[in-house]
A protein has these predicted regions:
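Class I SAM-dependent methyltransferase SAM-binding "motif I" and its flanking Rossmann-like core
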Residues: 104, 110-176
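Hydrophobic anchor at the start of a short beta-strand
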Residues: 73-75, 134, 223
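C-terminal and late-domain segments of enzyme folds
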Residues: 1-35, 42-56, 60, 64, ...
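Structured helix-beta-strand junction loops
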Residues: 97-98, 130-131, 161, 188-189
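General beta-strand structural signal in soluble alpha/beta enzymes
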Residues: 7, 77, 102-103, 134-137, ...
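Mature, structured domains of secreted/extracytosolic soluble proteins
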Residues: 89-92, 97-100, 108-130, 237, ...
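Portal/gating segments that form or line small-molecule/metal binding sites
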Residues: 40, 46-106, 110
Length: 249
């Protein structure tokens, strides 16, 4: 059974992000089936910066949240930071066994450049198809969508979720301006999912014949859904749900 996708607006692993991290662990518990939940923090997007720091922050945060909620986790860095490590079959084996695969933020172009066609991405897809939670924060979330923007312009994402781009670090007071910029550079018909920091959405499929995908909001901020450039925005807060259309493969 395929696992849920989770998208996060950034500020991952900081104080205040605990509800979202606990939601990821709860979603992964069925795959773990009573053993320690295996968490792989994959700092690919941070490869130009401090990937080990990003991963260490993630490992510490998951361990802290698990202890608070009476869970046991085996959280570790899986250091995929370039083509060589993406081809490493030992790292791929760790990814294939994970119950939560978390892609923290960094540079938006790195994950879509490094992952496609690699052993690492094949292992992530295998784990996700087997029920693992696939989560991305900020640039990690952007990469999972069908399209993303970078400092060099727009580029295709990994198309795990389709029909929209993820807009991290979203704020209500600046959303209109953000949406206007989005309209200026987005491909025709592409929606935008805006996510505040320390806030994310977790996929909740609505059934095999559903025409939409449900996304449960978790965290202190808001999520914003604009179904097409210039369309009216719908917002939701923690515990509420947004729906995006199912885009056929």
């Amino acid at each position: 059974m395929i696992g849920p996708v989770a998208l996060h607006g950034g500020g991952e692993f900081l104080r205040g992000d605990e509800p979202f991290l606990e939601a990821l662990l709860a979603a992964a518990a069925p795959r773990a089936d009573g053993r320690s939940i295996r968490v792989a923090v994959v700092p690919t997007a941070a490869a130009r910066g401090q990937p080990d720091v990003a991963a260490a922050n993630g490992v510490a945060a998951f361990e802290r949240v698990a202890a608070t909620n009476g869970r046991t986790v085996d959280a570790r860095e899986v250091r995929v930071v370039g083509p060589t490590s993406a081809a490493d079959h030992g790292l791929a084996a760790e990814l294939a066994e994970a119950d939560v695969i978390h892609l923290p933020g960094g540079d938006p172009d790195l994950i879509p450049t490094i992952m496609p066609g690699s052993a690492a991405w094949a292992a992530i897809a295998e784990a996700h198809a087997g029920g693992a939670v696939l989560a991305g924060a900020s640039a990690g979330a952007m990469a999972l969508a069908s399209w993303t923007w970078t400092s060099g312009g727009g580029m295709g994402g990994l198309m795990v979720v389709r029909g929209f781009a993820v807009v991290p670090h979203a704020k209500r007071e600046t959303w209109e301006a953000t949406a206007a910029r989005f309209v200026a550079w987005a491909p025709d018909g592409l929606g935008a999912l805006g996510l505040a920091e320390r806030t994310g959405v977790i996929e909740e499929p609505l059934g095999p014949d559903a025409t939409h995908v449900g996304w449960r909001v978790v965290g202190p901020g808001e999520a914003f859904w604009m179904p097409a450039p210039g369309a009216e925005t719908v917002s939701a807060r923690s515990g509420e749900r947004l729906e995006t259309p199912v885009i056929p493969l």
